[in-house]
Amino acid sequence: HQGYIEPQSATALWSEDDSKLKIWCSNQGHFSVRNEVSALLDIPVSTIKVIPMEIGGGFGGKITAHIEPVAAILSKKSGRPVKISLDRSEVLQCTGPTSGGIVKAKIGATNEGKFIAATCNVYLDAGAYPGSFIENACNTAYAPYDIPNLQLKGYDVVTNKPKTGAYRAPGTPNSALAVETAVDEISKKLKIDPVHLRLKNAADKGTRKADGTIYPEIGMVATANSVLEHQHYSESLPEPSNKSFKVGRGIAFGYSGNINGAATVIGNVVEDGTITLITGAVDIGGTRISIAQQFAEVLGIDPTLINPTVADTDSIGYTSASVGSSASHKNGWAAYQCALDIKDQLEERVSKIWDVPKDTVIFKDGRAISKTDSKLIMSFKELSSLLDETGGPITGRGNVDARGCAGSFSANIVDLEIDIETGKVNILRYTAFQDAGKAIHPSYV
């Protein structure tokens, strides 16, 4: 289970005065809640207003509308606002744990360790209804490797259990465990170093994945090389803590990709030199600050001058849920487009103030400057204070529908000891290597 500390909670108010249903909820996607409630209760989306609240932990477990429709119906019947908050046992019973499964992986390799063919059959437990993340499991199984011949089969298995749900790259750990175990078996049988074996077969730019997509520039090779260069890889294993313990070292690689979706961002320039940034992205993991940083970079102003806020479903254009490592990407892109829009309007406004052609004005590093007269300079704060008397407010907008997937790779080395008498395991040392791409906010990574 996702194990978030904060349980689901929602309040609904179905007003007879304006026939409007208002929902306050802690969900990873308030537009998703609006659409699901609309479908379940058979009412138009225009009559539903969802106000996002802080959600705490989510990890994929707060995507689906669980209690919001129930609160809405009770509010309609009672004529009063209704709040439902789950206790811990209810969270575990009804919100959807991750899928268990069975994965069978087989790899064919030459005596030199080159992978030439592989198969993978994945069986994931969907629970009471179809819909396990079988596509994820199949698509990521051999994603770190360049194998010319692949056959993958996925089985979405319905069982007499609670419905399963998303949990941090759902399906991926299941298939990765099986594949990496098979790679280790080949390494031992051929007496080839496990990292060198993976590097020999590493996916790179131009490699075709199992789903037919072709990798652009990726970091699998760089990740493997970083392992080879690290002292953890070259140093000897520590001694066991006592005679009943045996020590060992494990090495494994993995892959995950972000999803995509629609996003909307609106920016309003305020007279005191700040910007109100309105987004439809629920903040999970620091989304607001990462969006503000990407916006601020375009204008060359300090991110602390950006005041991001998450709007309700009536106040911003459709924005898909904050899931699948997508929020900073799609909403950051929308913020970038919004900042470009504002930048263009600032240059237009300054050209009118200075009475010069717009193409002679450029806004960068937090100020407007003239390309033809070095004496003409105006700071963002000064320009902001003149908006009312020079043409009115400046508002920018960014709308995107992000497509594509940027694959990310990882490697992990763990030293551990196990008590051969009791089975107790102690982790002695763990080093993770992350193909993080561009860290927008490094301290959050």
Functional labels for PLM-detected ranges:
Residues H1-A222, E229, E239-V445:
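Cofactor-binding beta-sheet edge motifs in enzyme active sites
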Residues S226, H230-S234:
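Short, basic alpha-helical nucleic acid-contact segments in DNA-binding proteins
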